[in-house]
Amino acid sequence: FDGCSGLKQVIFPNTLKEIGDYAFRSCPELITAVLPQGVEQLGKYAFAGSGLKTILIPHSVYWIGEGAYADCKRLNHVTVPDNIVSIPDRMFSGCDSLSEIKLPETADRIGSGVFENCSSLQSIVIPESVRSIGENAFGETHPKFTLLCHRLSEAERYARNHNITFQIIY
């Protein structure tokens, strides 16, 4: 369905286990794609450039490919389930309407460019479990952007090294 400009909705069977690489990339009218419990993998750029506004990734997903939701211009709310430990490179890059995201408390890695060009994102809580943050993970941050992080965490170190405004949380 890559590049299917008229696709508006997808209903997946409950038996679906994997969404392939580029499966729904560049489907700008796709605003509804409810992933069933049982889906385990989301391929690279699977929904990149789609019209999705909100995503809820099922707890059954254990692997997400690079850029899975990149350039989703309407996307504004995301919840990533606790079983995802690595937020892949460029997962949400270019999602300029993204204003709210909940990262799992179990995340240990935030990839490169994950939140690059997410101009509506004003703050993000970085779990204490994060041990690695990739280059340009937050791109060019705007003046009101704040990383909410734990004292002496990797996120605090990253914020200091990249001149990103941060606030210590407990």
Predicted features, each with a name:
Residues N161-N163:
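Short, structured coil segments at secondary-structure junctions
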Residues D2, G20-R25, G43-A46, G65-A68, ...:
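Consensus positions within tandem repeat domains that build extended binding/scaffold surfaces
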Residues C4-E18, P28-Q41, S50-W63, K73-S86, ...:
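Structural signature of tandem-repeat unit edges
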